[in-house]
A protein has these predicted regions:
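Short coil/turn linker and secondary-structure boundary residues
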Residues: 12-15, 51, 89-92
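Axial heme c-ligation environment in periplasmic c-type cytochrome domains
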Residues: 39-47, 64-94
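C-terminal capping alpha-helices of c-type cytochrome domains
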Residues: 54-58, 82-108
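Sequence context of c-type cytochrome heme-c attachment sites
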Residues: 7, 33, 74-76
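Sec-exported extracytoplasmic/periplasmic mature domains
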Residues: 25, 29, 33-36, 49, ...
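Gly/Gly-Pro-rich "capping" loops immediately C-terminal to redox-active cysteine motifs
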Residues: 17, 21, 33-62
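Short pre-active-site segment immediately N-terminal to redox-active cysteine/selenocysteine motifs
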Residues: 16, 24-27, 35, 83, ...
């Protein structure tokens, strides 16, 4: 994907996380829970420790290419059996979602 370096702070950007939570509510919550429980797609708890910020941003913004080319994404598809549809999210939306994921994983 196009993201090779994503700058994240040591502490949480609260405004960005709040914006990301709104995006989650509209675009993501029908398939993803913020716990480790699978809904349609995998739960988000711990995702920021399992995946790099770059992987997360590339997956959110370029889902099809990641599923086609990335072994970790392909393995996830085999577990969930449902291909994540492209949500047409902007780079900003994706970055805000990443910050919400970080908040969900306990970053203060």
């Amino acid at each position: 994907g196009k993201f090779t370096k994503v700058d994240i702070g040591a502490t949480l950007d609260a405004a960005m996380a709040t914006s990301g939570e709104k995006v989650y509510g509209v675009k993501c919550s029908s398939c993803h829970k913020t716990t480790d429980e699978k809904l349609v797609g995998p739960g988000w708890k711990g995702v920021t420790t399992r995946r790099t910020p770059e992987w997360i941003m590339n997956f959110i913004t370029n889902t099809d290419e990641m599923i086609n080319k990335d072994p970790a994404a392909q393995a996830q598809l085999e577990i969930c059996l449902v291909r994540m549809p492209n949500q047409s999210l902007s780079d900003d939306d994706a970055r805000h979602l990443l910050e919400f994921m970080r908040k969900n994983d306990g970053v203060k």
